[in-house]
C-alpha cells in the first residue's frame, strides 16, 4: 500500500500517485504497454481477482510487470516525508529514500530495539520496556538453563553407564582371549593378522606426502607438540594398538641408528627421498611406516613406524 499523501511536504505529482490506493507509490512497478504505475502490493492484490490493468482494462499479468523508469524513481526519492513516528512525537521530515534508515534509528520508534539497563541486559522493543520485569525474565532464563542442565546430566549419566558396561565387556573379552590363547596358540597369529590388516587399512587411508625441507625436522618435540600429533593420529583412525608406539617414535631417542644423531642424519640425508611417507592430516608431520618401507635398511626404519615432525615443508602428493 502507498504512503499517505498528507505526510508529504508540498504537492505531489499525480504521476506518482497509485491509481489503486490513491497513496504515493511504494515499491512501484509498471505495466509495460500502457505504462501505468502501481504500488507493488496493490497491483499484486488486484491481480488475485483479475488479470487486467486497473486503469484501462488492458490484459496484464504479474509476469508482465517491470520496475518504473529511473526518472520516476528519482522523483519519488526526492519527496520530503514526515516520519512514521510523528504520532509518537517525532518531528523529522526526511527524503523518501532515507526514510528506512531514519526509522531504524528514530528515538520515537516504539519498536526500536533497546537494552534493559536495570541489570538483565535483555533487548526488546521500546514500547515493551515500561512493562518489563527483570526478575521475571531472569527467572525464565534460569529455569531454561536448569532444564537444559538436567537434560545434559541425564545424558552424561547414560553415557557413563554405557562406557562402564563397554569397559567391563572389553575386560571380559580380553580375559576370554587370554584363556583361549593358552589352549590354542594359533589364536595369537590370528590376532596379529587382524591387527596388521587394521594398520594397513589406516595407512592406505592417509595421503602420500613429500618433504621438501628435511632440514626443518623437529627431532626432540616437547610433550605439548607430541600431544597435538597424537590427537591427530587418533582422529585419523590410527589403531589404538600402535598410537603410543608411534608417538614414542616421534623423538630421536627412539629412532634407529641411521637417524639417532644429527651427524648420522646429515650423513644419511641422501636416502630420505626413498622413504614412503604419509601425511598426518592437518599437520606438518608424516608417518614412515615399517610395512611400507621394507626397502629401507634396518638402520633407517623402526617398528611399527616413525613419526617425523617438521617446522614446514610437508606437502601432499
UniProtKB/Swiss-Prot annotation:
Pfam families in the record: USP8_interact (PF08941), zf-C3HC4_2 (PF13923)
Zinc finger (RING-type) in chain: 18-57
InterPro entries to which the protein is assigned, alphabetical: NRDP1, NRDP1_C, Znf_RING, Znf_RING/FYVE/PHD, Znf_RING_CS, Znf_SIAH
Catalytic reaction(s) noted: S-ubiquitinyl-[E2 ubiquitin-conjugating enzyme]-L-cysteine + [acceptor protein]-L-lysine = [E2 ubiquitin-conjugating enzyme]-L-cysteine + N(6)-ubiquitinyl-[acceptor protein]-L-lysine
GO terms (BP aspect): autophagy; extrinsic apoptotic signaling pathway; negative regulation of cell migration; negative regulation of cell population proliferation; negative regulation of mitophagy; positive regulation of protein catabolic process; positive regulation of reactive oxygen species metabolic process; proteasomal protein catabolic process
ZnF locations on chain (SIAH-type): 78-138
Gene Ontology MF term list: erythropoietin receptor binding; identical protein binding; interleukin-3 receptor binding; protein domain specific binding; receptor tyrosine kinase binding; small GTPase binding; ubiquitin protein ligase activity; ubiquitin-protein transferase activity
PROSITE patterns associated with the record: ZF_RING_1, ZF_RING_2, ZF_SIAH
Recorded superkingdom: Eukaryota
Class in the EC hierarchy, top level: transferase
UniProt entry keywords in alphabetical sequence: Apoptosis, Autophagy, Metal-binding, Transferase, Ubl conjugation, Ubl conjugation pathway, Zinc, Zinc-finger
Post-translational modification: Autoubiquitinated. Autoubiquitination leads to proteasomal degradation. Deubiquitinated by USP8 to get stabilized which induces apoptosis.
EC number(s) from the headed UniProt entry: 2.3.2.27
GO cellular component: endoplasmic reticulum tubular network; perinuclear region of cytoplasm
Functional pathway: Protein modification; protein ubiquitination
Subunit field text: Interacts with USP8, ERBB3, PRKN and BIRC6. Interacts with CSF2RB, EPOR, IL3RA, MYD88 and TBK1. Interacts with Clec16a.
Function according to Swiss-Prot or TrEMBL: Acts as E3 ubiquitin-protein ligase and regulates the degradation of target proteins. Polyubiquitinates MYD88. Negatively regulates MYD88-dependent production of pro-inflammatory cytokines. Can promote TRIF-dependent production of type I interferon and inhibits infection with vesicular stomatitis virus. Also promotes activation of TBK1 and IRF3. Involved in the ubiquitination of erythropoietin (EPO) and interleukin-3 (IL-3) receptors.
Name by which UniProt lists this protein: E3 ubiquitin-protein ligase NRDP1
Source organism: Mus musculus (Mouse)
Organism classification: Eukaryota, Metazoa, Chordata, Craniata, Vertebrata
Annotated gene: Rnf41
Amino acid at each position: 500500500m502507498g504512503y499517505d499523501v498528507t505526510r508529504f511536504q508540498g504537492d505531489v505529482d499525480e504521476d506518482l500517485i497509485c491509481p489503486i490506493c490513491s497513496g504515493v507509490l511504494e515499491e512501484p512497478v509498471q505495466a509495460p504497454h500502457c505504462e501505468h504505475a502501481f504500488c507493488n502490493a496493490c497491483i499484486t492484490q488486484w491481480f488475485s481477482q483479475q488479470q487486467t490493468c486497473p486503469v484501462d482494462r488492458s490484459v496484464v499479468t504479474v509476469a508482465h510487470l517491470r520496475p518504473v523508469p529511473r526518472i520516476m524513481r528519482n522523483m519519488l526519492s526526492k519527496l520530503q516525508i514526515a516520519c512514521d513516528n510523528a504520532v509518537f512525537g517525532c518531528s523529522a521530515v526526511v527524503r523518501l529514500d532515507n526514510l528506512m534508515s531514519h526509522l531504524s534509528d528514530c528515538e520515537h520508534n516504539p519498536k526500536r530495539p533497546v537494552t534493559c539497563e536495570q541489570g538483565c541486559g535483555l533487548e526488546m522493543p521500546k514500547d515493551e520496556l515500561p512493562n518489563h520485569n527483570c526478575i521475571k525474565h531472569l527467572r525464565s532464563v534460569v529455569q531454561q538453563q536448569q532444564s537444559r542442565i538436567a537434560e545434559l546430566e541425564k545424558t552424561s549419566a547414560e553415557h557413563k553407564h554405557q562406557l562402564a558396561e563397554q569397559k567391563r565387556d572389553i575386560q571380559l573379552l580380553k580375559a576370554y582371549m587370554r584363556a583361549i590363547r593358552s589352549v590354542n596358540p594359533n589364536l595369537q597369529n590370528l590376532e596379529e593378522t587382524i591387527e596388521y590388516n587394521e594398520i594397513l587399512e589406516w595407512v592406505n587411508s592417509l595421503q602420500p606426502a613429500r618433504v621438501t625441507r628435511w632440514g626443518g625436522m623437529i627431532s626432540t618435540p616437547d610433550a605439548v607438540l607430541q600431544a597435538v600429533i597424537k590427537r591427530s593420529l587418533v582422529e585419523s583412525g590410527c589403531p589404538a594398538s600402535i598410537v603410543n608406539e608411534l608417538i614414542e617414535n616421534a623423538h630421536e631417542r627412539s629412532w634407529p641408528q641411521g637417524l639417532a644423531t644429527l651427524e648420522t642424519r646429515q650423513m644419511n640425508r641422501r636416502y630420505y627421498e626413498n622413504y614412503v611417507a604419509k601425511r598426518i592430516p592437518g599437520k606438518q608431520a608424516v608417518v614412515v611406516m615399517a610395512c611400507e618401507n621394507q626397502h629401507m635398511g634396518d638402520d633407517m626404519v623402526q617398528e611399527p613406524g616413525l613419526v617425523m615432525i617438521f617446522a614446514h615443508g610437508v606437502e601432499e602428493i
